């Protein structure tokens, strides 16, 4: 999970750095990284969800549930950036459509401008005790 969080944080940083770039290959590469994270985390989530390696009533079964919730929270945060990239790539010059492609990001912000999905992910990660 920690490796995915690092990759997600890097993807968010790449979005912040590259979203206004007119280099389509750069923006496409950033979008592709989001797609790769999405695919890999879904695979790992499904493997965990379908695993029978945890005994009923054990503390590990509870942690399995916490890990599953962490994968879901990570995906929810990733989806904000992934969706924004998808809209961003519709524009040759992203400055022309900034209001449109920033919609997913703005929809995720609380009154202070902070990401609600990021806050939820951090809360969920704090619940994991391995």
Enumerate the predicted regions with their spans.
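C-terminal amphipathic alpha-helix
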Residues: 1-39, 66-130
């Amino acid at each position: 999970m920690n490796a995915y969080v690092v990759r997600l944080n890097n993807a968010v940083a790449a979005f912040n750095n590259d979203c206004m770039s007119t280099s389509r290959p750069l923006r496409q590469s950033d979008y592709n990284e989001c797609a790769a994270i999405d695919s890999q985390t879904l695979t790992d989530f499904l493997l965990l969800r379908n695993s029978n390696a945890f005994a009923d009533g054990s503390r590990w079964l509870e942690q399995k549930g916490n890990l599953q919730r962490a994968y879901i929270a990570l995906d929810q945060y990733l989806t904000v950036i992934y969706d924004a990239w998808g809209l961003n790539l519709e524009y040759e010059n992203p400055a022309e459509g900034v209001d449109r492609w920033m919609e997913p990001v703005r929809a995720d912000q609380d009154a202070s401008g902070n990401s609600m999905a990021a806050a939820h992910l951090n809360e969920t990660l704090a619940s994991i005790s391995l």
